[in-house]
Amino acid sequence: MPTINQLITNGRKGIIKKTKSPALKNCPQRRGVCTRVYTVTPRKPNSALRKVARVRLTSGYEISSYIPGEGHNLQEHSLVLIRGGRIRDLPGVRYHIIRGTLDTAGVDGRKQGRSKYGAKKAKVAKTASAK
């Protein structure tokens, strides 16, 4: 507990909020250009080849971002849209690429959770017995 004199000289320090996605600069999404597309192995109990892209954003930052879903069409100089959201088993990857926007294609053959992967609804063949 501080004394009155300590409060007069120093005052109370406010709590500083630290953002988890500084490259977005308080925007919901940011546009960027892929500078490198590669795979990374995850941290200890997991084993895989996670697809990652190095992206130069319009905010000036260069970040690593995860490419969700099975298969992708990204390469160097592709335009992508970035959202926040880290990948727990990839150190330093704090952003996701949004599928189905700009140069990023949606995931083919996706039936559930389509909105998260930019997949269109599959066409259903109409039968003649439906009267």
Swiss-Prot record:
This is Small ribosomal subunit protein uS12. It comes from the Bacteria. Coiled coil: none annotated. CDD domains: Ribosomal_S12 (cd03368). Residues 112-124 have a biased composition (Basic residues). Part of the 30S ribosomal subunit. Contacts proteins S8 and S17. May interact with IF1 in the 30S initiation complex. Belongs to the universal ribosomal protein uS12 family. PANTHER family: 30S RIBOSOMAL PROTEIN S12 FAMILY MEMBER. It comes from Endomicrobium trichonymphae. NCBIfam families: rpsL_bact. The keyword Membrane does not apply. GO terms for biological process: translation.
